[in-house]
Swiss-Prot record:
PROSITE patterns: TOPRIM. This is UPF0292 protein TSIB_0423. Belongs to the UPF0292 family. It holds the Pfam family Toprim.
Length: 126
């Protein structure tokens, strides 16, 4: 089970590293975790501006990935952002978040813990 999750997590991290759009996260710690994983693309933090303003800024990118936390607040933010962005006819990836949640739901609560989970899985040496 852990070996499968680790392999899938590595695939998703590779996807994040190769992503050429903008990633929307809740806060600074989320961005730091993604940077530690080698993600170099543009990242916008939701905690800085109203959602409508963030959606407008993000709509200038061709591809947008929403990576909010896995709690109720994160779910609500992801839904609202998706609605705003679909109004701008943007291509929005919420599947990556859903996949990460499926793999890590018992181990972490959100994106800021992703780097730690990756290190734990890696240390198990499958």
């Amino acid at each position: 089970m852990y070996a499968e999750n680790y392999k899938r997590l590595e695939q998703l991290i590779d996807k994040l590293r190769e992503f050429n759009g903008v990633i929307l996260v809740e806060g600074m710690r989320d961005e730091v975790a993604l940077r530690k994983l080698g993600v170099e693309t543009e990242i916008i933090k939701l905690s800085r501006f109203p959602l409508a303003e963030i959606a407008l800024t993000a709509s200038h990118y061709h591809d947008i990935m929403i990576l909010t936390d896995f709690d109720r607040k994160g779910e609500d933010l992801a839904k609202k952002l998706t609605q705003y962005l679909e109004g701008y006819k943007c291509r929005v990836d919420t599947n990556t978040r859903r996949e990460l949640k499926k793999i890590a739901k018992k181990d972490i609560k959100g994106i800021e813990d992703l780097y730690g989970l990756y290190l734990r899985f890696k240390s198990l040496r499958f």
